C-alpha cells in the first residue's frame, strides 16, 4: 500500500490534525542503511516525524531535524519537504538495545541527554532554527515539546511502529494534532483526555489502520473536514552535480592535496548510500574551474 498523509481541520477551526502511514517509506530507508531493530524503530520514528512536519510547510519549503543524544545511536537526522519526500539516517545503524520486558529501547539508544534542533528552509535569507533539550528521547514527545516551546503551538504527537522479530517493518505511522489560535483551554483539555484514552497506535497500524481511521479515533465527536491527502515516499536530493559543487567550494589547495594523496575522491551520501567517484581528471577539471572563477 502506498504511504500517505491526511490533513484535517475541525469545522470550528479550533483544531488541526495530521495522520499518516509510513510503513513502506520506513522499510525502504531502513533497508538502505541495513539497520538493526532498535535503530530501525528510532529511524522509523524520525521519518514519521519528518513526514508530519513536512506537511505543515508550504510548497518549496523544507525542514531538517537533528535528534542528538548521549546514547550509542548518537543521532537521528531527517530531512523532509512539503511534497511528502523524506530521507534520513542514524549515527550507528547497528545499535540494538532492549528493555527488560523485551521491547525495543529507543529512548536509551538515542540517550536521555541531548538536543533536538529543527531548521526550516522557508525561502528566506536564513533558515529558521529552534533547539530544545530532549524530553524523553522517544521522538514523539520531543517533537511535541519543540512545537510547544519553540513555535508556541500547543501540540500533541503520536508516533508508533511495529517491528517483526526479523527486523521487518510491519507498520509505522503517526499523528500530530494542534490547537489553533486563539487557543481554548477547554479544547486542549478535551484533546488530551481523548489522546490518553486512545488504544495503542502500534496496534491500530499493525491491524492495517489508515490515516483516516487514526483521525476518526483522534477527533471522535468533533466535526471536521479533510483538507488534503498526499503521498509520502523516500527521495534523496543528492546528485553528482551537488557533490561537485561541494568539491568546488573546498578550494584548489585542498583538492590538489586530495589528488596527490588519494588520486581522486569518493563521496558517499549519508542519506541514501549512493557513491560518487571523482578521478584525477575530474579533480583537475574542478581545479581549473576554480582558477577560472578566480580570474
Curated annotation (Swiss-Prot):
Major localization listed first in the record, in broad terms:
cytoplasm
* CDD domains found in the cross-reference section: Hsp33
The record's listing under SUPFAM superfamilies reads:
Hsp33 domain (SSF64397), HSP33 redox switch-like (SSF118352)
Q: Which InterPro entries match?
A: Heat_shock_Hsp33, Heat_shock_Hsp33_C, Heat_shock_Hsp33_N
User: Which terms does the UniProt entry file under GO BP?
Assistant: protein refolding
Entry keyword set: Chaperone, Cytoplasm, Disulfide bond, Redox-active center, Zinc
Cellular compartments annotated? Cytoplasm
* Disulphide-bonded residues: 236-238, 269-272
- Entry annotated with the keyword Zinc: yes
Q: Name one GO cellular component term.
A: cytoplasm
The answer on whether this UniProt entry bears the keyword Acyltransferase reads no
What the entry says about post-translational processing? Under oxidizing conditions two disulfide bonds are formed involving the reactive cysteines. Under reducing conditions zinc is bound to the reactive cysteines and the protein is inactive.
**What is the annotated signal peptide range for this record?**
none
Q: Which domain of life is it from?
A: Bacteria
GO molecular function list: protein folding chaperone; unfolded protein binding
Chain's role: Redox regulated molecular chaperone. Protects both thermally unfolding and oxidatively damaged proteins from irreversible aggregation. Plays an important role in the bacterial defense system toward oxidative stress.
Q: Which family does it belong to?
A: Belongs to the HSP33 family.
| Protein name, as recorded | 33 kDa chaperonin
Amino acid at each position: 500500500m502506498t504511504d500517505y498523509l491526511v490533513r484535517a481541520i475541525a469545522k470550528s477551526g479550533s483544531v488541526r490534525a495530521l495522520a499518516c502511514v509510513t510503513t513502506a517509506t520506513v522499510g525502504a530507508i531502513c533497508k538502505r542503511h541495513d539497520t538493526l531493530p532498535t535503530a530501525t524503530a528510532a529511524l522509523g520514528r524520525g521519518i514519521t516525524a519528518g513526514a508530519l512536519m513536512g506537511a505543515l510547510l508550504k510548497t518549496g519549503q523544507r525542514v531538517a531535524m537533528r535528534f542528538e543524544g548521549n546514547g550509542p545511536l548518537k543521532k537521528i537526522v531527517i530531512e523532509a519537504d512539503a511534497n511528502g519526500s523524506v530521507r534520513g539516517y542514524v549515527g550507528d545503524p547497528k545499535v540494538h538495545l532492549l528493555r527488560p520486558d523485551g521491547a525495543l529501547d529507543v529512548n536509551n539508544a538515542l540517550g536521555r541527554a541531548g538536543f533536538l534542533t529543527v531548521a526550516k528552509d522557508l525561502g528566506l535569507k536564513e533558515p529558521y532554527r529552534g533547539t530544545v533539550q530532549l524530553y524523553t528521547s522517544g521522538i514523539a514527545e520531543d517533537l511535541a515539546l519543540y512545537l510547544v516551546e519553540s513555535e508556541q503551538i500547543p501540540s500533541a504527537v503520536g508516533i508508533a511502529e511495529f517491528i517483526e522479530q526479523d527486523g521487518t517493518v510491519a507498520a509505522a505511522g503517526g499523528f500530530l494534532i494542534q490547537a489553533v489560535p486563539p487557543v481554548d483551554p477547554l479544547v486542549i483539555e478535551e484533546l488530551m483526555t481523548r489522546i490518553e484514552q486512545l488504544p495503542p497506535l502500534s496496534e491500530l497500524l499493525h491491524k492495517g489502520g489508515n490515516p483516516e481511521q487514526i483521525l476518526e479515533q483522534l477527533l471522535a465527536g468533533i466535526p471536521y473536514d479533510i483538507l488534503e491527502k498526499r503521498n509520502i515516499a523516500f527521495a534523496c536530493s543528492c546528485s553528482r552535480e551537488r557533490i561537485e559543487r561541494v568539491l568546488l567550494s573546498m578550494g584548489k589547495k585542498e583538492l590538489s592535496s586530495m589528488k596527490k594523496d588519494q588520486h581522486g575522491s569518493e563521496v558517499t551520501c549519508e542519506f541514501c548510500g549512493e557513491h560518487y567517484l571523482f578521478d584525477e581528471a575530474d579533480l583537475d577539471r574542478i581545479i581549473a574551474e576554480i582558477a577560472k572563477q578566480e580570474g
